[in-house]
Amino acid sequence: MKPILTALSLAVTLHAAPVKLFEEAPVSVTEPAPGIVLVDFGKVAFGNIEITPPAGAKGDFTVHFGEAFADGRINRKPPGTVRYSFASGKWEAGQVMVIAPPVDARNTQQGDGKTPPAILTPKEWGVITPFRWVEIEGWPGDTKPASFVRRSAFSADWENNASHFESSDETLNRIWELCKYSIKATTFAGVYVDGDRERIPYEADAYLNQLSHYATDDDILFARDSFDYLIKYGTWPTEWAPHLVFMVKADWMRTGDAKWLAPRYEKLKQRILMERVGSDGLVTSNAAQIKKGDIVDWPHTERDGFKFTKANSVVNAFHLKAIADMAELASALGKTDEAKAYRERYAKTGAVFQKTFFNESTGLYRDGVGTDHSAIHSNFFPLAFGLVPTDKRAGVLAFLKKSGMKCSVYAAQYLMEAMFDHGSEREALALMTADGDRSWKHMVNSGTTITWEAWDQKYKPNQDWNHAWGAAPANLLSTYVLGARPAVPGWKTATISPRTGDLAFAKGKVPTPRGPIRIDWKNGSGFVLDLMLPEGMGAKVDVPAAEGSKVVFVNGAKAEAKLLDGRWILMNELSGKVRIEVK
């Protein structure tokens, strides 16, 4: 795609990553009623349709596009902003016809001074919409699948085989496939947008999208272009701004590219909420910011009764995480004094955070100053961000396990991180695959092919059915169950730390800038990990300690390893192709 819009004055030119139209054949073509053809493409994608009518075709037609299906037909009155549209015209015999839906006013608006402009797709494509099914009224002849081709917009460089995940839990495998495809399908705009309703980038959406894109395909352009757009067009929630710091930190860890970081570093200082810091170092909130700004979670019904106050634990947890990341980024650029200042601020404000928000009587973090209420968010955000002291973690974890999924699909990214990072992978995986309507199992069982904006329609009646912020398992299963993450910027050294839960096995392929990591582990009476690292990459490895295990072997030879907190920590860095056995 070309640069986004035209007259934007930025130090960094705005671009969109390359996207193109791919031709896709239907999986089935049927006639549900006389004169009606129903075309099913198997999955939802953003696009339009190319139709080749038979020779001699004439008369009128109506083409219906739909995301939802009901009673064997496209649902023409879907809930909320689930997509349905139609286009009518006259057949042109012997001509290949591109049929596109009408323009949607909201997701093509170009700004009113209050709302960022929607991302426009190329005019030469015609209008695109998310759809799986097409119904054609007035089809003038025999139905042949070759007559119908969906023109679907995806990343031009997407590589389907770049990543893989498979485990002993078939539901988990289906969740992975749903989330991976969700990342692919939502690349249609060249930057990360929040779904079809608005087609606008938001910082939190973009960061979650970035993590899952990294886990499913080796691409950095989408995240970088989304970041540059959001620096120009920031959005309203308080906690969304620090997500831009998270995005740059994630890019730095993936690429080690200081040249990209350097011209963006100063802009990040405007995203860490320093303008709202009081004399004690905490971020404060006025009445307007409490009413609209401090978001905690979205939709608002997902906040677990959170009590908003003049200084709250969630906003301050985000502030501290951003400060910690800024210290690392400053060091990466050789800004030694700034890095030191950030570290000192983090230590000082972190102590105030503990004193202000930790409730010694309950062992939990309170929502804010002046309340003893403890929402789940006030506890998993600090835990995920490394703010909870070691001696306080057990109580916080117990609370999280008891509470369950009392947060949105957005915040679930951080709830899962908090649990996986602190030895509760069994419970994290159980939440992913739980019965009921607040899990990814519910999404896959619903038949959706792209993740939703919310757990269910009843939790957000106007939700999109094409929202990549609901695809967190794409990165969580790669990072934690397979266990691969960068140990140093640029992946010169990886950390391999598989979290097994109750799974008997898992295997997969993790894309990195240095080439794919292949992981295959089995967890039974012992633990076996087959690992293949790309050339030029080393790995620090730790593995589960099977009950009663006493020794670790690497390629058949006894390895130096230390037993710590139920895991064997290998003392020497590994490279190439290795087999690790715990006995």
Question: Where do the language-model regions lie?
Answer:
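Non-catalytic C-terminal accessory modules of carbohydrate-active enzymes
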Residues: 20-22, 72, 344, 351, ...
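C-terminal capping/lid segments that line or modulate ligand- or cofactor-binding pockets
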Residues: 198, 244-245, 283-284, 301-310, ...
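Extracellular/oxidizing-compartment recognition motifs
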Residues: 17-190, 205, 219-223, 259, ...
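Active-site acid/base region of carbohydrate-active enzymes
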Residues: 133, 143-221, 225, 235, ...
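Hydrophobic h-region of N-terminal signal peptides that target proteins for export
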Residues: 5-16
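Positively charged n-region of N-terminal signal peptides that target proteins for export
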Residues: 1-3
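Well-ordered alpha-helical scaffold segments within catalytic/enzyme domains
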Residues: 139, 208-217, 244-260, 318-336, ...
